């Protein structure tokens, strides 16, 4: 009975989170695009966010003991902070540097929340229960996201900006905090203990290869998210068409949670998703994009389930927090790659074609490294995985170091901007006082 209640609580939390996420994330890029932000500026807003997410995942992975003794308390604190930070974003549209910083902090707290929620699922359930709960959480999230998308579409059509932005983000805040209250009553372990033994090479290789596959898929997905709204704007589509993409996308997410089963099905979904992404730029009728959104979401669920399946198999050997950190970091590595690429490619069409190509590369890697579904013998797939893991490890180390330096530079530049602003204000005040 207790285990059943735990499942219901975690699924219900995902339901509340889905509504809140569908509005805060689903509206953010369209909000920037229709506020006059070009693709390059949208990408620059996202770069510090990706860096922050990667660093948080790295810190959590390197020293999970920071969270073991106060596990539940940290989850709830991060859960609440994340929702408050996201609520602030529409009020900062006129100041891109401050918006970028707030967006980074919102995503840093979101990254930590996602890692710890994932670790909680791994801690509360085992084996097939993890997959079962994850599938139901995904479906519940997609269902409530659909409701959120309907609300978002109606409000966007009924109210003018920025009033519609304020109303939607405030509604999302209230629903999101309802999920936080539910989480307080959920029997999550107050503390957990992670394994201290070294991880065997085979597990490292499997985890590292999965990280690369997921990172590439998320890079393509984030490039799609960055470029789709600007493409529709070029086609002359009204904003409610852009918002409506999330409605059909959420319907696809609900069905996709139950369509894909097993590694072969996951990779089939990845292949279809890659082809669909590359085809978007050639669809000239805006309303057709709504149907494509359904199909891309339906197939992308296979990617999420592949990641969850791999790390549910290895979490007892690398630790629940570390397994979850791996899973979450792939999204932020993908976001960083997508943001940097989109900074240099100004054309939404070029971005979408490249996004499809990156997803196809990820699919090909999965086809030759995931032993359960590889098109080569299992032994050969392991050897290829080992080579790819060694290569990608160097790339990840470089990315991590570069992220640290870029984050330092960003914070320094922001501090300098703030200092100059303060000096200018003092200068104007002084002129006023002396009557000049």
For each predicted feature, which ranges?
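Helix-loop boundary and gating motifs at the non-cytosolic
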Residues: 1-55, 204-246, 404-435
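C-terminal transmembrane helical hairpin of 12-TM major facilitator-type secondary transporters
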Residues: 266-304
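Substrate-agnostic recognition of the 12-TM MFS/MFS-like secondary transporter fold
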Residues: 9-29, 45-61, 75-82, 102-160, ...
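A membrane-interface helix-boundary motif in multi-pass transporters
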Residues: 154-174, 343-361, 402-414, 429-436
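Cytoplasmic membrane-interface "Motif A"-like loop-to-helix N-cap segments
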Residues: 65-80, 261-273
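Juxtamembrane intracellular "pre-TM" segments in multi-pass secondary transporters
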Residues: 1-7, 187-214, 382-410
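C-terminal ends and interior cores of transmembrane alpha-helices
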Residues: 77-95, 271-286
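C-terminal membrane-cytosol helix-exit motif in multi-pass small-molecule transporters
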Residues: 173-192, 363-373
């Amino acid at each position: 009975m207790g285990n059943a209640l735990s499942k219901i609580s975690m699924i219900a939390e995902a339901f509340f989170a889905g509504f809140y996420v569908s509005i805060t994330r689903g509206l953010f890029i369209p909000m920037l695009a229709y506020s006059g932000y070009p693709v390059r500026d949208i990408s620059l807003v996202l770069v510090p966010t990706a860096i922050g997410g990667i660093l948080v995942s790295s810190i959590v992975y390197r020293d999970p003991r920071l969270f073991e003794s106060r596990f539940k308390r940290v989850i709830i604190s991060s859960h609440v902070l994340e929702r408050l930070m996201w609520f602030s974003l529409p009020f900062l549209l006129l100041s891109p540097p401050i918006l970028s910083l707030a967006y980074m902090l919102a995503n840093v707290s979101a990254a930590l929340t996602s890692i710890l929620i994932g670790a909680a699922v791994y801690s509360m359930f085992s084996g097939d229960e993890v997959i079962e709960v994850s599938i139901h959480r995904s479906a519940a999230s997609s269902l409530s996201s659909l409701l959120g998308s309907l609300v978002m579409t109606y409000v966007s059509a009924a109210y003018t900006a920025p009033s519609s932005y304020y109303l939607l983000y405030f509604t999302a805040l209230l629903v999101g905090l309802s999920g936080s209250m539910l989480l307080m009553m959920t029997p999550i372990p107050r503390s957990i203990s992670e394994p201290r033994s070294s991880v065997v090479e085979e597990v490292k290789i499997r985890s590292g290869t999965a990280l690369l596959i997921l990172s590439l898929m998320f890079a393509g997905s984030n490039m799609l998210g960055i470029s789709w709204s600007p493409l529709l704007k070029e086609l002359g589509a009204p904003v409610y068409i852009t918002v409506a993409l999330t409605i059909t996308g959420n319907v696809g997410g609900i069905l996709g949670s139950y369509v894909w089963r097993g590694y072969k099905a996951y990779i089939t979904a990845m292949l279809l998703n890659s082809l669909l992404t590359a085809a978007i730029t050639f669809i000239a009728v805006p309303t057709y994009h709504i149907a494509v959104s359904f199909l891309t979401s339906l197939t992308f669920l296979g990617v999420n389930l592949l990641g969850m399946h791999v790390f549910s198999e290895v979490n007892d050997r690398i630790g629940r927090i570390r397994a979850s950190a791996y899973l979450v970091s792939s999204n932020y590595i993908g976001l960083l790659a997508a943001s940097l690429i989109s900074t240099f490619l100004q054309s939404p069409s070029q971005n979408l074609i490249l996004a499809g190509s990156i997803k196809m590369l990820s699919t090909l890697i999965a086809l030759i490294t995931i032993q359960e579904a590889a098109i080569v013998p299992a032994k050969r797939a392991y050897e290829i995985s080992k080579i790819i893991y060694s290569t990608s490890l160097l790339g990840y180390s470089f990315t991590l170091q570069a992220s640290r330096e870029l984050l330092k530079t960003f914070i320094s530049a922001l501090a300098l901007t703030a200092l100059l602003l303060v000096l200018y204000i003092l200068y104007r005040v002084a002129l006023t006082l002396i009557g000049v």
